[in-house]
């Protein structure tokens, strides 16, 4: 992108605003190097990064990038074998700690936020945990080495503290004792790295020791008392040892960094990129900017676009279309009406979008991808235009025409101004034709009425104007697309008090064509305002309808949620009641069995089985409940005496003998006659003869559809095996089997013993015993029924 357009449209001020948002040296470099991009993929990637930054800012307060200095010079010094100082090491330590923090930050968010680019950028980071911990442990943020940097450093510092404590103790005798009256001030100070006291010159003889300094007047001598000379010597030795150990540690840490300088430098660059993304997101928030769509066809539509450098409380937003049906737009209207600002808004927002920045416009705005943006915009708000001004503009236009391509955007402000109106209008039309022949996109502002007709008659060209309020005599700064500007000179003059005679005389001097053109424009403005009013009314009605729809949707969702909750609550309550009934029923069955054992013959076994099976059906079968259509269809089937039916509760096929009532039938199941609920039966074959014509035939269990004659309990838990055994024996009895085989395996013997105990208690079992060796041996039990 040419440098002139960046200067003309004040692109540098956008960069300055971004610089106020970055906190790292590498981030500042990226902002300063920022340029509009011309590759659609690169533009979309840059916008994706800004969108990620905006999401992170909104949800997490931004990517955690702290202030970071430029560490490149320090890394270069390491590469040549130099020893870094504490501040340089602290700066590198902050970079390494930030790498770890951001890596963890993004890893923790991977299941929460679907970033478009940040996770890819995260992969460019190289986490160096051991080196980071080493630097963090050894170096404070201000560059001071910590006591944990080495045991030797910790030891020598403890020694220094001990000696200093002894020195202060002895010095206290001078500052607080009887000799304090000989001091200029009762304090301890340092001269030449040694502790001294300020002694009045006339009392020098009262103190032994060494004089290290004197005051400017000579009235105070700074004396090191003899009693602490040895301590000061020891202190000095310890301090020199500390310095030596610090230098050794700095060299050691610098050597440890040497193998990783390339990775650390790359990390710093990636952190700068994260900082740059943060800055773009913060600027977007400050400007209330949105992400623009990218049109590969250069179909530009800026919705309520605002110039980012104008006070947001004063700026007027405009819809600016270009490139769909029209490649050229001619904007007419009065001076100070906002034409130039409209041009600059279009150009600057286009540059911002191509730089990966959000733009101050409404959602769903679109930008194009132009390889160049050219502009001829000068300070032509003054009417004093001369030949030199015209020449300067024409020189710029010639330069633009030489570089045009079909992917260029050209902005002309007051095209053809500064010369004779007729010649200027002709030149303006010819220049617009030349731009159109290349296929470039152009927006031009002008005063010339001839260009209004040009915009009306030329293909892919549309007129536009800046609205002017004739009542207030003030521009509204609103762009009216499709409506050419009209002169308001007569209206303004009349409202300002110019005699009507003069106004009418002036009107008579212009051609009838001009009158008709102005009248046509006036009618267009009225129609536009009427359409705009109707549109606003429709928009409000649509918004109201949407609001009602949203409320109804929310209410319906709440209703269904509460309904489902109540249904589930009722089902749970019903199942709870059934559980209680089941418990009571089991107790009753147990009592019945005891009665049967005590008084044989009083209770029939099939009654016990029927009662127990019916109780098992008390719980709601949720899949069956949900399949209500099938259940209703089954209930609609007419049943007749003699029909063959499948009884779901027994998993047996039987024959209908007699209907007790609407809900119950007597069914022949093998050797047993059972009372069965209607809704547990499914007709499998219609009757072919009436009950009177069709005799009831007893069918042995062996010929009926029923359970297998073998039950395999191997691999089951004890409780489950016993439950399966109980259910199987009931089914076998109903099927009329004379004998069955129970396979329990050997294992620990628990299930085998359980089977034996169960069969021993069951009064329907005649005999039982292990199978022959060739049929399973002690791993299976053969049961014979009565």
From Swiss-Prot:
Keywords: ATP-binding, DNA-binding, Endonuclease, Hydrolase, Nuclease, Nucleotide-binding, RNA-binding, rRNA-binding. One of its GO terms (biological process) is mismatch repair. Its EC number is 3.1.-.-, 3.6.4.-. ATP binds at residues 333-340. InterPro entries: DNA_mismatch_repair_MutS_C, DNA_mismatch_repair_MutS_core, DNA_mismatch_repair_MutS_sf, MSSS, MutS, MutS2, P-loop_NTPase, Smr_dom. Residues 682-709 are annotated as: Disordered. Pfam families: MSSS, MutS_V, Smr. Disulfide bonds: none annotated. Residues 711-786 form the Smr domain. Signal peptide: none annotated. GO terms for molecular function: ATP binding; ATP hydrolysis activity; ATP-dependent DNA damage sensor activity; endonuclease activity; mismatched DNA binding; ribosomal large subunit binding; rRNA binding. It comes from the Bacteria. Belongs to the DNA mismatch repair MutS family. MutS2 subfamily. Homodimer. Binds to stalled ribosomes, contacting rRNA. Endonuclease that is involved in the suppression of homologous recombination and thus may have a key role in the control of bacterial genetic diversity. This is Endonuclease MutS2. It comes from Lacticaseibacillus casei (strain BL23) (Lactobacillus casei).
